Amino acid sequence: MSESSKSSLFERFTPVLLLATIVLAFFVGVLWTKVSNLEKGGTAGAANNNVAGDTAQAPNGKLTEDQAKNVPQVSDKDHIKGSKDAEILLVEYSDFECPFCERFHPTAKQALDEYKDKIAWVYRNFPLDSIHPRARPAANAAECVASLKGNDAYWKFADMIFSNQEKYLTDAGLSEAAVASGVGGSDFDSCYKANKFDSVVTADQQGGETAGITGTPGSFIINKKGEMWLVPGAVSYESLKATIDEALGS
C-alpha cells in the first residue's frame, strides 16, 4: 500500500476513532457517577424514583411531616447505642463494606462522646449488594452476634469491622471479629452459615428505601417532638453537630 493510501485510510478512520473515544468516556463517566452517588449516600434521586416524595429537596435538611411519616419508628428491635428515649436519635442506614460509612463511623461516635446521654445512635442495615458483595454477609454476621451475645457485643463487632474493613470482611475476618466480641466460634459459624438473618437485613433495607434512602451512609436526626432532619452521606462532624444543635433547639 502506498504512503498516500495509508494517509487517506488514516484520515478516513480518525473521526470514527474520535467518536468512539468520546462515547466510551461518556459511559465511563456515567458509571463512575452512579457508583459515587450510591456510596456517598443520602437520598439523592429519591424524588425521581418516587420512593419518598422529595425528601432530598427538604429545605435545610428538615423533613416535612408527610416525609417524616415514611421513616420507620425506632423500636426495641433496633440496634441502639444509648437510650431510645434520648433527646436526639441518630438513625443511620449503613453498609459494612461502604468506605464512606467507614469514614462516618468515628464521626457518629464523636457525637455520642460530646452529647453524652442527650443522643442515641441507631444502626440499620442498608447493603448495596450490586457494588458491595460482602456487605450483606457482614450484616448477617452482625445480627448473629447480636442474637448470641446482645447489644454491646453487636456494637463492638461493628466498631471492629469499620476499624479495618479489608481485614474483617472475609469469612475468617468476620468470625475473628465475632469471637473478639464475645461470641463462641462454633455458635457464630453455625448461625452465619445458615444465613439466619437475611430477612432481617432485607427488612431494614426496605424500610430505608421507604424513607427515601438510596445510598450509604444515609441518616436522620430525630428530636423529642418527632421532627426529623436528613443527614446525607459522610458529612463532617461540624455539619453533623450543626444539625443536632438545630434539632435540640427546635
PLM features: residue spans?
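Extracytoplasmic/periplasmic mature domains of Sec-exported, cell-envelope-associated bacterial proteins
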Residues: 62-71, 77, 134-137, 239-242
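A generic local structural motif
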Residues: 75-78, 107-108, 205-206
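Structural alpha/beta surface segment adjacent to cysteine/selenocysteine redox centers
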Residues: 86, 91-96, 102-179, 211-214
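N-terminal, intrinsically disordered, polar/charged segments of Gram-positive cell-envelope systems
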Residues: 38-72
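C-terminal cap of thioredoxin/glutaredoxin-like
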Residues: 2-43, 175-250
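Conserved strand-loop elements at the edges of beta-sheets that form or border functional pockets
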Residues: 83, 92, 233
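A short beta-strand-turn-helix
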Residues: 71-88, 113
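Short clusters of hydrophobic/aromatic residues that line enzyme substrate/ligand-binding pockets
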Residues: 80-81, 168, 231
